[in-house]
């Protein structure tokens, strides 16, 4: 499971021009679910996300976690994080979990994360417009297999 985490001042999701989710200070997380992922990958990612110190303290050093700054999270499904562009010019997405199973893990991830933080979500599988006002910018890629 891959989570692309961006520290944001604000983030939102629109579908067909209608805003369906919005957060203020926190993280925009683009989540890619891979074929071999399980609930153990969810547990590893959430443990790391909640404790990551990506917010500045009083002297500007990244030393505070999202709980300490009372931040929120916007989670958006992103199967293209499974893309491989090693061969040719069209990415190969065969590493992505099939949609039905991926939606189950995506929903489980969002539900488990919401036990720790306020969580908003995009709509799994939909074409979305995702707005992000980066803070920093600070962007981190977490791969559950490497945690």
Curated annotation (Swiss-Prot):
Principal location class: cytoplasm
Enzyme Commission no: 3.1.1.96
Protein name: D-aminoacyl-tRNA deacylase
Superkingdom: Bacteria
GO cellular component: cytoplasm
Organism: Nitratiruptor sp. (strain SB155-2)
GO biological process: D-amino acid catabolic process
MF terms (GO), sorted A to Z: D-tyrosyl-tRNA(Tyr) deacylase activity; Gly-tRNA(Ala) deacylase activity; Ser(Gly)-tRNA(Ala) hydrolase activity; tRNA binding
């Amino acid at each position: 499971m891959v989570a692309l985490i961006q520290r944001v001042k604000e983030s939102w999701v629109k579908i067909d021009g209608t805003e369906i989710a919005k957060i203020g200070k926190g993280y925009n997380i683009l989540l890619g679910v891979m074929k071999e992922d399980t609930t153990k990958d969810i547990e590893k990612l959430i443990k790391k996300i909640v404790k990551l110190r990506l917010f500045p303290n009083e002297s500007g050093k990244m030393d505070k976690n999202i709980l300490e700054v009372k931040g929120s999270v916007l989670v958006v499904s992103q199967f293209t994080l499974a893309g491989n562009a090693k061969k040719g010019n069209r990415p190969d997405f065969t590493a992505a979990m099939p949609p039905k199973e991926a939606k189950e893990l995506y929903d489980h991830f969002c539900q488990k994360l919401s036990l720790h933080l306020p969580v908003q979500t995009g709509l799994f599988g939909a074409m979305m417009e995702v707005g992000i006002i980066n803070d920093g910018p600070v962007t981190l890629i977490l791969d559950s297999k490497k945690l």
